[in-house]
Amino acid sequence: MALYFERVSTVVSACGPDARFLLEVIIAESEHRHEQWQDLSVKSLAKHLRLDEAVVSASLSELVDASVVERCVAPRNGLKGRGKVTYALCLGNDPELADRTYPQHAELLQALFSGADMVFAVLGSELGKAGELGKSRKSREFDEEAAIARPAKGKRQLLGSRGRLSIRNRLLFAVLLSRSDQFGEVQVGLPELAKLTGMQPEQVKTRLVRLMMLGLIRRHIPGLSSKVFAAGRIESSYFLNIDAVAPQGAIAVHITHDWEGKAYTHANVLRGDCKNARAGQLHGIEAPSSLLRLLMGQPGKVFFLFQYLLCRYASHLLSRHWQKLASDKPIEDAELRAWIERDFIKAPKPALASEIDPELKAGRSGEAASDLKDGAGGEAGQTCGCIYALAMEIAREYRVRFGQADWVDFEAEAADIRILPNMSDFGYRAITILFQPMLVGLGRFSVLREVSRGVVNIGSEASDAEFDLQRRLDFGLVCLPRKVRKALGLQ
């Protein structure tokens, strides 16, 4: 979904971020009022948005130069002095702007482009001195009492600093939000974000970190280029906090009783097998040879992205086959198989007839034209089959564990489920899902603690903010850059 300002070519090509934000506010406010904004002036806009008048004046001048807004000076009728200056949209009845409603995340987008004072707690500010948490707890094993954010005995809990969302951060968050799905997940590259916001890439990177620090980006999966993937380049993915203003969906966390047995993800195991195979240590390797050939020698960030893709595939299975996943019977999903092939098998390049060896023409007629990016060739189908099997294993793991809440009927209510990736070094000790709609028996935020094998109790937390920051990081509920985590003494 494009924001309003994106539909005006002169704004996208010539205006800076402040002017883009201002135009979106003017159009959105007009839609809210069901009429053109009357007496639109520098002073009224500055007051409405709590901005400096100089910023508003400069932005309106940009919009005037782009022929999007016209400057109107009221006649003085013989009186001395300058007439009152107001501004009006001059877009006319542009069909591109006829539909002025946000189809998704409307409440949050309307709040971003309004005079609402959007203030959020800065993550980590409650820790006091940097490194305080890291020094106080070396183990990450779950302890309910330690995990709840409560003041130490004899001390008052710090309120923590608050961060006000600037107009440029609002614009960036809105651009991300406008392209996200129902769960707030969006895949977009830095160059595209820079183009849409009118900012430089480095400025966008800095502001993305700010959004993370304010808890508005729950999870960031960095993009990368690798021959492993068919597209060659996978853009970054973000899970946005769509509940920042008002609850939109629901979250459930499952914490296992088998702490050591669930310490690794499928990608962790694959990476270990690849390292051992490369070193010639073949004993105990579980990964299929085709996957080893695909992933061997790849850096850790490729395995992290591979795990994210597996979780996307598993989310599809959980949403479509919840009941079937309860048994060990094979599940055939042609849509998922096609999805995996698109992600891992490159499309064939058309060759000129003169470039094809005549002796090979007949032999190629019945063969698949696509090859894996690593050149695995005829093993492409086998490799994709292995990836399909891994996704099925993950889906069944999540089905078993969340199915322990046997008072909840995911199938009957046709829940749409999305796995929220947790910390890469936390394994499956705690797993998190987003789901819509809300389900009977689970609140907006639910924590299932496995007290013994197969038996869970539901926690009393009303929101993820009741956990300390390390737990929220572990569960995938918030994310911070590595440097920030290190400075705060977090893992």
Report the location of each language-model feature:
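Positively charged, structured surface patches that bind polyanionic biopolymers
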Residues: M1-G16, H32-R33, C90-G163
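Electrostatic interaction modules used in gene-expression and signaling proteins
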Residues: T10-P17, F21, E35-Q38, L51, ...
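Short glycine/serine- and small hydrophobic-enriched flexible loop segments
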Residues: I27-A28, S178
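Extended, helix-rich scaffolding/adaptor regions
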Residues: E31-H34, V42
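Intrinsically disordered, low-complexity N-terminal extensions of nucleic-acid-metabolism proteins
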Residues: V85, E96-A98, A174
